[in-house]
Amino acid sequence: MKKFLILTALAYVLAGCGGADVAPERSMAAIYSDAYENFNDGDYEAAADLFSQAEAEHPTDPYAPDALVMAAYSRYMDDDFSGALIATDRFMRFHPGHQDAPYILYLRGMCYYRQVSDVRREPGMSVYALQQFEQLRERFPSSEYAKNAENKINILKNYIAGKVMYSARTDMKRENWTSAITKLQSVVQTAAETVMTPEALYRLTQCYTAIGLPKQSSGYADMLRKNYPDNQWTKKLDK
């Protein structure tokens, strides 16, 4: 919200900064002002086109990066996520050290995050979103967007682990024990902090029991009891 209050003020400043000399092409101020008018009217597609035009026609203007930020955000608001990603790619290519780089990485993550779908489908967008948010956290840990990114990272890790668990349960129903074990172990090893880990440990005890390996089954049962003594999946062990 703070960014766009600043940009709103910028639009008014730009609208009033034209000099007496009029260039043959439209100035950054004129295009930007029209773009912001469309944005405020909710015509995000037209706004995005104009913001993109402003940046493309005046790439060396001091406000070109801001126009590109607004082009990306307008595409995002129009649910044109592929268009928003193209704009953010251009921003990071030409302005990687700009003060708005953390926001652009966050916006990239949100473009993928908004497309995350049913837990029964392939990870796809959730993996891409996670990569963007983790990059933001790593590159700009003190950014105001890093905290929001951290929340999204936790949600996405649980979501992705949920997808793996769904697939592992399906394998177990089909008695495809090797595949199920591989997937369950991946949850335990790479997503240990998620809420899916206790169930993954419990399912591993079932899988190893099913293939006649009681020692391995007992090992995972002990791990479950030690790390999650009061969890519902731990209580199932003794039933």
Place the predicted regions along the sequence by residue:
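Hydrophobic core
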Residues: A9-L14
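Sec-dependent signal peptide recognition
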Residues: K2-T8
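Acidic, polar-rich low-complexity tracts and alpha-helical solenoid repeat scaffolds
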Residues: L5, G16-K239
